[in-house]
């Protein structure tokens, strides 16, 4: 089915609505959306997807929730003009994630001042975090602490890069110590727990192999290929 799209943006609201509401509020975005919907409906068009975007997370979320209370047209969700990558990822995860957990949102867009490919990766990660996407690896890792005896940050980054395009619906744990690591990650399909110059590979919380540190990553990736 081909959908027509209505895109309302807080930066380009009609002056009449800005005068009425004072600034681009959620109510102003929703009113603008319904005005455009009415124009399409008068022409017999009802297959429409609506987007109401703002660079302010609470406004975007409130607009989508208010719109959903009033009708059931499909909604495209996303925070616009999010800024640098770090800020943009946080804003997008907050806004899109909040709505997805409410059951709101039919299509999404992560807007970043970066390579558009990174927007796609971020969108997939948000869907996975919300429990709506099963494909792809879910990596869990612990914060570093006094028990960490390996380059945990470097190892996590290596695992992430190596599995970026893996579509297996598995959870991989990268833990900094063998004290709490296996227990904290027992729900993972497979993982690493580091020791002092060595580490172990575990599956479902059970140790399956003990190796020198430099062999951990290759061994982990080899086992993942066989899953």
What are the residue ranges of the model-derived segments?
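Short, small-residue-biased leader/transition segments that mark boundaries at the very start
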Residues: 1-2
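Conserved, mostly hydrophobic/aromatic
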Residues: 6, 50, 99, 142, ...
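Short, small-residue-rich loop/turn micro-motifs
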Residues: 8-10, 195-196
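Catalytic alpha/beta core domains of metabolic enzymes, predominantly
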Residues: 9-12, 17-167
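ATP-dependent carboxylate-amine ligase
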Residues: 143-147, 170, 211-219
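Terminal leader/tail segments of proteins
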Residues: 186-187, 193-197, 204-227
């Amino acid at each position: 089915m081909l959908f027509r799209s209505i895109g309302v943006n807080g930066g380009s609201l009609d002056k009449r609505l800005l005068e009425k509401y004072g600034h681009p509020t959620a109510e102003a975005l929703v009113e603008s959306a319904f005005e455009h919907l009415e124009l399409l409906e008068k022409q017999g068009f009802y297959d429409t997807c609506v987007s109401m975007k703002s660079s302010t997370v609470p406004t975007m979320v409130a607009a989508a929730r208010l719109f959903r209370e009033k009708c059931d047209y499909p909604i495209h969700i996303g925070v616009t003009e999010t800024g640098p990558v770090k800020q943009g990822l946080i804003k997008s995860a907050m806004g899109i994630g909040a709505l997805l957990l409410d059951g709101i949102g039919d299509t999404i867009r992560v807007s970043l001042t970066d390579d558009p490919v990174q927007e796609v990766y971020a969108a997939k990660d948000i869907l996975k975090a919300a429990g709506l996407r099963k494909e792809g690896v879910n990596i869990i890792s612990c914060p570093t602490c006094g028990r960490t005896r390996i380059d945990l940050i470097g190892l996590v980054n290596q695992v992430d890069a190596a599995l970026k395009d893996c579509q297996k619906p598995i959870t991989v744990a990268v833990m900094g110590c063998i004290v709490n690591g296996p227990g904290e990650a027992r729900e993972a399909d497979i993982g690493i727990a580091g020791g002092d110059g060595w580490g172990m590979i575990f599956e479902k919380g059970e140790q399956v192999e003990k190796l020198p540190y430099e062999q951990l990553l290759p061994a982990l990736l080899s086992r993942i290929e066989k899953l």
